[in-house]
């Protein structure tokens, strides 16, 4: 989304690495009090020559706002289909955010506002998701045969 925005608004082509740097340094999904700016280097869309523009956090907010809200909506959808016991546990203990996007300015606040559930950032959000997936491989056979998954499979087959 950031690459497309820079191309359309600034007539400049940037790569994925630069887009990620923009997201990390000035990205926000919840408005902050101060506006940040960043000089971004790329290639002019028309001439192909090197070009530099200044991009603001307010611009990036407009780019990231919709995808972040879509993620929040999906979290809400999952919570709505989660068992009452688990939702009670989650509402008491909060949501732990993982992954790179969890570190976006205001992401925890956005989710907290939408769900009403406290959100915290994991200690090592970039790698804890992969670590957890690796640990879960030890339990994969049990997970396939567990009563919850059997009930889920039945519900999915019946179209619920």
Where are these regions (language model features)?
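Phosphate-binding glycine-rich/basic clefts of nucleotide- and phosphate-handling proteins
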Residues: 1-65, 76
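Residue-level signature of catalytic and energy-coupling elements of molecular machines
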Residues: 2, 75, 97, 133
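Interdomain boundary/hinge elements
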Residues: 13-18, 89, 123-125
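Acidic, glycine/GT-rich loop-and beta-edge segments that sit at the periphery of enzyme/chaperone cores
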Residues: 15, 135, 139-160
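Glycine-rich phosphate-binding loops at beta-strand->alpha-helix junctions
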Residues: 31, 87-111
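Active-site lining segments that contact anionic ligands and/or coordinate catalytic metals
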Residues: 35, 92, 116
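Phosphate/ATP-binding catalytic cores across multiple sugar-kinase/actin-like superfamilies
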Residues: 63-90, 136-139
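Conserved phosphate-binding/catalytic loops in two-lobed NTP-binding clefts
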Residues: 109-135, 139, 143
């Amino acid at each position: 989304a950031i690459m497309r925005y820079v191309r359309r608004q600034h007539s400049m082509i940037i790569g994925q690495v630069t887009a990620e740097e923009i997201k990390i340094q000035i990205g926000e999904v919840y408005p902050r009090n101060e506006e940040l700016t960043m000089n971004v280097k790329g290639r002019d869309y028309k001439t192909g020559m090197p070009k530099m523009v200044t991009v603001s956090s307010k611009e990036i907010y407009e780019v990231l706002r919709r995808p972040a809200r879509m993620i929040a909506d999906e979290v809400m959808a999952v919570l709505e289909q989660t068992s009452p016991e688990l939702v009670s546990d989650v509402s008491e203990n909060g949501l732990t955010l993982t992954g790179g996007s969890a570190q976006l300015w205001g992401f925890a606040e956005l989710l907290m506002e939408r769900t009403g559930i406290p959100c915290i950032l994991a200690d090592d959000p970039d790698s804890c998701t992969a670590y957890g997936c690796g640990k879960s491989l030890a339990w994969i056979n049990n997970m396939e045969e567990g009563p919850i998954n059997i009930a889920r499979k039945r519900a999915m087959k019946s179209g619920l």
